[in-house]
Amino acid sequence: MKILVLNAGSSSLKFQLFDMEDESVMAKGIVERIGLDKPFLSYSKGTDKIKFDKEEPINHKDALQWVLNTLTSHEYGVITTLQEIGAVGHRVVHGGEEFTGSVLITEEVIEALERNKNLAPLHNPPNLTGIYATKAVLPEVPMVGVFDTAFHATMPERAYLYALPIELYEKYKVRRYGFHGTSHRYVAMEAARRLGKTLSELRIISAHLGNGASVCAIQGGKSIDTSMGFTPLEGLVMGTRSGDLDPAIPIWMMRELGMSFDEVDNLLNKKSGVFGLVRGRSFDMRDIEDWMAAGDEEAKKAMEVYCYRLKKYIGGYAAVMGGVDVLIFTAGVGENSPIVREMVCEGLEFLGIKLDKEKNNSRGDAIISAADSKVVVMSIKTNEELMIARDTYEIVRGLT
């Protein structure tokens, strides 16, 4: 069966087409500048990379049609007809409490997603737009929703409740949800597979470090805690997001600086994190590393704040699990930054975490802990799209 995986953003549509017989990627790419002038499609098939342009603005439905036309085209296609697509898997950021696992998308599911839109106003509306576009263009093809929050549905109350009036949770579902669940689930399963262990016997700490970043405690194969909360703003220091901070600071900014709700929201989500600490020069950790190596004190400070926050979370999660067996670094920074991994692990020998400096200098998939390290430290390339394809395949296969 061939599965098309879609991730719809506000002005983009990412896609991958999988052949589930061997889980190979047949083609992948992204349509960017949806709703704007001069949209373009970046398309990869094997080693071939092609870019297509349009002059006029397009919507998500047009973008999906463009992708499907390319996938079936004589010159660039990898399938002959659209009938070869057995199902479409959608990344949906927020499932709320209603969706604790991946589901077949029905009218009832769409209605529930519409109700939950306000839980993730930046992400869920475009995810829904992608679902509506698929319904219009591929009406006969089953769709599956895979939720970033679902893996964290196993968190106990003590981990997900905020110490706020309980009515806020009961009436409005204000609680910690967590995100990046599909990535944390994938790398945890991959770590267990590579170590020849069952997932249920391992205590795993997974650090997903991209522009957005979160860390997750996994025990008995289940997420028991994670750093992101009601929104993806809580937790670690990120590229442009503040992560944890005193909740009175936004109130102070509005009262003392006269900032509006939108201005505070924009500052915390788009102008903070390492970007804010280096005065808005860059949110790319590669720049921060280069500047730090050149003696830039602000970059050094930003790196220290970034790594210190993650180190605290690792210590905390080791405490709640009574130790740790595997520490995983994943996503852009986690997979490719030896200096971040080194600074985070430095001083954690008391937990049994010891890096091998030479192995740590590798990028991508590797065991990077020393031979005498009690904890296995791994760098694993995440693959959320494959996880979505697998879930979609399992659900749709059960329909026949």
Swiss-Prot record:
Active site: 148
One Pfam entry name: Acetate_kinase
Keyword terms, alphabetized: ATP-binding, Cytoplasm, Kinase, Magnesium, Metal-binding, Nucleotide-binding, Transferase
GN (gene name): ackA
Sample GO molecular function, one term: acetate kinase activity
UniProt pathway annotation: Metabolic intermediate biosynthesis; acetyl-CoA biosynthesis; acetyl-CoA from acetate: step 1/2
The family this protein is said to belong to: Belongs to the acetokinase family.
Protein name: Acetate kinase
EC primary class: transferase
Subcellular location: Cytoplasm
Subunit-structure text: Homodimer.
